[in-house]
């Protein structure tokens, strides 16, 4: 029984790698650039992330599997991380969130960490709405 990993940039598969069960130290790393090849793209090995590696928020996610006789078994839940690619020539503001829970108890304070980048101003104004009702306003210094 071996182990395997799949890594996605947004929803594009960019790594599908199997590790031998005899290797007890399965550490690896991947560098994602606009030249990273998209796998399983109708056998077109020239398709890269160039058209998708753009200014904005993106999701990188990975999933681990056990592999038995070449067949992947059930995998773990995805491990996801939100990233931002910043193109300083773009004038488009960006807002991205950090890790937060999707369910809360009634008595809990809802905490949603976020970052703001607005190349047009030195202090960005952010309004938080719930069901169309303004809850709060914050000013974020760059």
Identify the meaning behind each predicted range.
Residues 102-108:
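Short, solvent-exposed loop/linker segments at the N-terminal edge
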Residues 65-73:
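Short, solvent-exposed loop/turn segments at the edges of extracellular beta-sandwich modules
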Residues 7-11, 64, 128-130:
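Conserved aromatic beta-strand anchor motif in extracellular beta-sandwich/beta-rich domains
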Residues 12-36, 131-142:
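Solvent-exposed serine/threonine-rich low-complexity stretches and specific carbohydrate-binding patches
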Residues 1, 112-118:
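Aromatic/hydrophobic beta-strand junction motif of beta-rich domains
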């Amino acid at each position: 029984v071996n182990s395997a990993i799949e890594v996605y940039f947004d929803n594009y598969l960019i790594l599908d790698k199997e590790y031998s069960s005899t290797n007890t130290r399965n550490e690896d790393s991947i560098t994602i650039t606009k030249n990273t090849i998209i796998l399983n793209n109708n056998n077109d090995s020239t398709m890269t992330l160039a058209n998708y590696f753009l200014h904005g928020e993106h999701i990188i996610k990975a999933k681990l599997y056990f592999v038995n006789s070449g067949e992947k078994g059930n995998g773990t839940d995805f491990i996801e991380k939100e990233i931002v690619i910043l193109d300083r020539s773009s004038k488009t503001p960006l807002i991205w969130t950090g890790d937060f829970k999707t369910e809360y108890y009634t008595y809990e304070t809802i905490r949603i960490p976020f970052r703001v980048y607005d190349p047009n101003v030195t202090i960005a104004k952010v309004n938080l709405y719930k069901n169309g009702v303004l809850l709060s306003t914050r000013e974020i210094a760059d």
